Amino acid sequence: VGDTVAIAQRTGAMTISNFEIHNWLLAQGVEKAHPMHIGGGKDFPFGRVKLTIAHHGSALPDGSYGGNPAGFLLTLEGKRIYHACDTGLFYDMKLIGEDGLDVAIVPIGDNFTMGPDDALRAVKLLEPKVVIPIHYDTFDVIEQDPQSFAARVEEQTQSRCVVLNPGESYRL
């Protein structure tokens, strides 16, 4: 959950999470929070959000159980974005990409999530137009070369890979 509480309190943004994290966020003083669960989708004023499976652990900063980990499938202004979050590779990613994806955001760090090889396999299952690698280089055991990953994606798939530096953004 990282800086979620501080950001939500500072900006008044609504958080969207599984039910267990939702309850924890409310207990931390977050005022606008919406609970969901895997497989569920909901239309919001900004677009549609659907929670997908993810294969990972889920503990909150205080050590309490964070519920089932999840990814997010977003539909915003007609664009479909899949944020895999912390996960390992799973074959059902093919289903997530079936209706077309404009962007897939996938971890490449290895050790705690899928690494570059499995992330490349995920891209082949998802078939997005654009891939953005995440969850790497924040500490020693997940150091990766995102440019090498990007080159492999563009050599072996029809996807374009966009490597973002901290603080950068990507516009659809």
Residue ranges and their predicted role:
Residues 36-98, 165-172:
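Core dinuclear metal-dependent hydrolase active-site scaffold
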Residues 3, 15, 49, 86, ...:
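Divalent metal-coordination and catalytic microenvironments
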Residues 1-26, 32, 98-105, 127-128:
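Active-site metal-binding motif and surrounding structural segment of the metallo-beta-lactamase
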Residues 74-129, 134-142:
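Metallo-beta-lactamase
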Residues 1-4, 25-27, 61, 92-94, ...:
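Short glycine-/acidic-enriched loop or helix-start segments at secondary-structure transitions
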Residues 10, 27-30, 44-46, 76, ...:
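Short, well-ordered coil/turn elements that cap or connect secondary structure elements
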Residues 7, 68-70, 92, 118-122, ...:
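A general structural detector for well-ordered alpha-helical segments in enzyme core domains, enriched
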Residues 14, 22, 26-41, 120, ...:
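Binuclear metal-ion centers of metallo-dependent hydrolases, dominated by the metallo-beta-lactamase
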